[in-house]
Amino acid sequence: MNQKVDDLHEDMTERFDAVDDALTDMQSTLENLTGDIRRLQQETESYLAVGADDAAAQEKILESFSDKLAARLLDSSLLRSHDLCERAQEILQERFGRDWGRLRSTSRRFLITARVLFAQMEAVPDQMDYSGVCILMLKALEAELHQRLFCDYSAFMEKHHPFAAEAARWPSVLCYRDNRGRWRRVAEERFTLGSVPYFCNTRVPEHISDAANEQDRRCLLSFAKQKLFRKGLSEDKIWENLTRIGKDVERVTKRYRNRAAHINAIRHQEARECMDFLIDVQQVLVWMMREFA
């Protein structure tokens, strides 16, 4: 009997030691990851200081930071646990329902990775920088909006008003005149979360005239009615949806993406709030996918 107890005790000790070793390895990996993030934040902060008076430059710097950080996180071996990924996907599928399959594959990967990273960081008692969690979720949001507000919108305009012949009829968010007065398409990489309020017409650039803005609104309404949203919405409901998207995206961009570029600006509470807002409670991204065609 005593031998069985001793064997059981030894087996339990080995299991606890294995768990402890795994947690130690995970903490070490997270610390290395945090170090990489901090160096990227320091580099970004120095660039932001240089371009402090240039809003376009600031947006470009913040977008570059988001891209680099997301790429670094997706490459981390820490986030490849099959069990954690499977559980994260189950939760996300429950949240999105049938719309989970309508998300782009890159968006699904961003969301799964964000949830796994959050769970891994919660298991470590130290106060950590949760910037990566927010950036990954926001990259998923950006991927869905980029496809619809830039790619699909551009294709819609090209179909109805070919750029080569009717560029003047395009909305200002998709085209501009160069220094020689020639019409040019806006480069695809110029689309960022920071540009979404302009695409939704909740913000209008100062240089856009009232007449040009009216044309922008006509183009946007036509696209939203025929392509962007599910069929049968009234014009009032379409504008209500566009306004909500523009304002919600501006909110998360300022509160989470922009702050994530600074060291220790995003802690556990902020990351939890971001996840709640986009996925778990207010479900902004879940709502968008229901409204999109």
Regions found by a protein language model. Name each.
Residues 1-72:
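Extended alpha-helical heptad-repeat/coiled-coil "stalk" and oligomerization rods
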Residues 129-132, 136, 157-160, 166:
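Mature extracytoplasmic or organellar-lumen-exposed domains after removal of signal/transit peptides
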Residues 145-154, 158, 269:
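Short, solvent-exposed secondary-structure capping/transition elements
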Residues 161-244:
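Flexible secondary-structure boundary motifs
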